[in-house]
Amino acid sequence: MLAAAGLVVIGAIVIVLLLFLDSYMPHWGRSSVSQHRPVQLAIDWTAVARVSKTTATLQVVVNPLLRPGSPIHDNVFSELKDLRADYARFVPWFPYPRLGVAELEPPAHGRTSWDFRRIDPIVLDFLRATRGHPQILNFSTIPQWMWKTPSAVPVPADPDVIDFRYLRGTRLRVPIRTVAAYFRRLVSWYAAGGFRDEYGHFHRSGHHYKIKYWEVLNEMEHSLSPRVYTKLYDAIVPAIQSVSPHTRFIGLALAADVPAYFTYFLGRAKHRPNIPLDFISYHFYGGPASDETPDTWGSDTFAQANGFISKVRYVETIRKRLSPKTRTTVDEVGTILSQARTQPKPARIPDVYWNYSGALFAYVFAQLALEGIDVVGESQLVAYPGQYPSVSMVDWNTGKPNARYRVLQLLRENIPLGSRLAPPVITPGAEAGGDLFYALALHTPSRKRKLLLINKRNFKIPVWFPGLKGATVKVVDEVSAGGPPREEVLTKDEYVIPEYGVAILTLSG
């Protein structure tokens, strides 16, 4: 009797545990869609949270794969041109000093080292590919010889070598006006046909480009304090204005959203008179821990994104209080795998990673659009092993798009400026679904009703909404991969969001 009763009790416990596990299995990566009840959405198309003013764009970081003669050069710049992106950000970066620093040695004995022969081809290809659109230029590296170091910092003879050692020193060796003069000459090369060097010799370029935006430095390299950065900004800006008077300026470019930088920089009293504060910028990268799998990436990294959005709201309170006319660009957004950073031979990146990363960018973009951020830039067009390959938007072997590129393209083509944004409500009883996917309804200026759906997990999620039948779907998922988004027309009021999928549904009628 006691044994039988014990078995009954054990059986009951097992049944309860199975029911418990069944209810929570979606959070653990179960892939069977048949066991999910569709999550029901309710949309009030009149409840407009914000009219979008947010532009989705990208950054282009200079590296050897962008040089003429690179096997992927033509494909990469063709893909850049096809995006037709406003505010594309162009950043020659310090690991390639011969591709981004125009004066590698200090002037001496009547001679200078100004040399644009390797720099110009990439700059001009970028300007041609983005012609007709406002661009952001950021030559982010102050020449190393301007910094105090125990000994001279060597420059690799090979321009294609990755050299993270070039960035050294925390105190300037030269006056700030010398730094400003470097950037004045650099901009004059592209905007005013050339410049006179430190000895009065004229260097002719023949370039007369209109530089719409210039971002001053990047990520507080050299451990710049808020005060020192602001002094540099206040010297560089008028120096550039003297040769390119219509250029507007972007400040900070912070890697970490440290409030002290925003509070100091946005305080008008901290600046010289008449210094413009047109834009501020800062960055966000998420990423899973090294021991995570694709099934757990989403739960961790989307939580990181939520933390970042909370910080954005705080930064916005500072901006609105101190400098409300200053606009904002979050001009680096991406994910980084710890096993695919700067290792010369990184671990293989799973194919699903590109979808996961694209989904995170779409989510951050949508959330920042609701916050009224002006520009959101995906990072970055081209990367490769040894140089953060997990942020690349194209295949570094072919130059063809991956899913990250296609997600940006999907957002650009379907969420125009002026769209009225209305976050849907998840019906009572289905609240758990909100942690698994994201939805944003929008009414475009052309009166089309659309629904953005983002799967935060590596399993399929069914969504139900009255009126979905007849909707046209464009989705970036593992099936479409780096190809154009898949298209389908729904035959019922239900849609199953693919694993880490990003879909735009255009409703009929």
Regions found by a protein language model. Name each.
Residues L58, F126, L186, W214, ...:
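Conserved, mostly hydrophobic/aromatic
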Residues M1-I10:
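N-terminal Sec-pathway targeting helices
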Residues V330-I415, S419-F437:
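Aromatic/acidic polysaccharide-binding cleft in carbohydrate-active enzymes
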Residues Y24-R84:
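N-terminal carbohydrate-binding accessory modules
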Residues L83-T301:
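Substrate-binding cleft and catalytic face of glycoside hydrolase catalytic domains
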Residues R486-G509:
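C-terminal beta-strand-rich structural cap/linker in extracellular carbohydrate-active enzymes
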Residues G287-T342, G399:
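Glycoside hydrolase catalytic-domain groove-lining segments
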Residues E431-K469, Y500-A503:
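Carbohydrate-binding surface patches
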